[in-house]
């Protein structure tokens, strides 16, 4: 049998701020797929949503704090140095050129995956990476027709399949439901409410100390 490829997980997002709803599913994917490395990629200007409330350098700092004690995770800041929107397909092209024939696994939540046909050059994503879709057990809605066609062609039935080819598969990975949203955290911070245990303590402390997201300065 062929030796497994080096397998790198990629989790992009605004991380505005990063919280356990980002981190726990990614950790479960890391374990299930046996990722060699997990890269978190903060977006400078996301093309599909409103501009983040906090600047890119500050959000990247929070991500670094969130994974500082995780030897399997690191922060990839390449999108922060681009002018204009951060398109995932361009990031994957850069990574593929740098890393060669490793297995790249783009991690997406189920709701984000449903919107994939609205992304720039979305079919090219599968040429450059696998897509790992995190979902709650037993909860899967109808897929848009274009997406259903890709799933039928590309679905992987075992995580191990992703370690033996560099790109092209779609894996649905059940993860523990974590009902935390950045919107809810920002709202609580603006009202001066506690967000303890919703995000890593190092992240919470920095946000409170700096007064980001409108947290009251006492």
Curated annotation (Swiss-Prot):
Molecular function GO terms recorded: ATP binding; nicotinate-nucleotide adenylyltransferase activity
EC number(s) per entry: 2.7.7.18
The keyword NAD is assigned to this record: yes
Any Pfam family: CTP_transf_like
Top-level EC class as recorded in UniProt: transferase
Pathway(s) this gene product operates in, as recorded in its UniProt entry: Cofactor biosynthesis; NAD(+) biosynthesis; deamido-NAD(+) from nicotinate D-ribonucleotide: step 1/1
Top-level taxon in the UniProt lineage: Bacteria
Keyword annotations from UniProtKB, A to Z: ATP-binding, NAD, Nucleotide-binding, Nucleotidyltransferase, Pyridine nucleotide biosynthesis, Transferase
Biological process (GO), any one: NAD biosynthetic process
Catalytic reaction list: nicotinate beta-D-ribonucleotide + ATP + H(+) = deamido-NAD(+) + diphosphate
Described function: Catalyzes the reversible adenylation of nicotinate mononucleotide (NaMN) to nicotinic acid adenine dinucleotide (NaAD).
Family recorded in the similarity comment: Belongs to the NadD family.
HAMAP family per record: NaMN_adenylyltr (MF_00244)
Protein's name according to its UniProt entry: Probable nicotinate-nucleotide adenylyltransferase
Organism for this UniProt entry: Halorhodospira halophila (strain DSM 244 / SL1)
Gene: nadD
């Amino acid at each position: 049998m062929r030796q497994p490829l080096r397998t790198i997980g990629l989790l992009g997002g605004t991380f505005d701020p990063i919280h356990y709803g980002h981190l726990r599913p990614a950790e479960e994917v890391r374990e299930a797929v046996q990722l060699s490395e997990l890269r978190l990629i903060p977006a400078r200007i996301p093309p599909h949503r409103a501009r983040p409330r906090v600047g890119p350098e500050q959000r990247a700092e929070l991500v670094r704090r969130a994974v500082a004690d995780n030897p399997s995770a690191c922060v990839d800041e390449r999108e922060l140095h681009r002018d204009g929107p951060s398109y995932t397909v361009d990031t994957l092209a850069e990574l593929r050129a740098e890393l060669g024939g490793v297995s790249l696994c783009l991690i997406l939540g189920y709701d984000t995956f449903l919107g994939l046909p609205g992304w720039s050059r979305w079919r090219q994503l599968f040429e450059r990476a696998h897509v790992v879709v995190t979902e709650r057990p037993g909860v899967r809605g109808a897929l848009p027709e274009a997406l259903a066609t890709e799933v039928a062609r590309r679905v992987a039935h075992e995580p191990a399949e992703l370690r033996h080819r560099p790109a092209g598969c779609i894996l649905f990975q059940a993860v523990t439901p974590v009902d935390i949203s950045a919107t809810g955290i920002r709202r609580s911070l603006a009202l001066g409410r506690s967000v303890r245990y919703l995000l890593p303590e190092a992240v919470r402390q920095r946000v409170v100390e700096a007064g980001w997201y409108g947290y009251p300065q006492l």
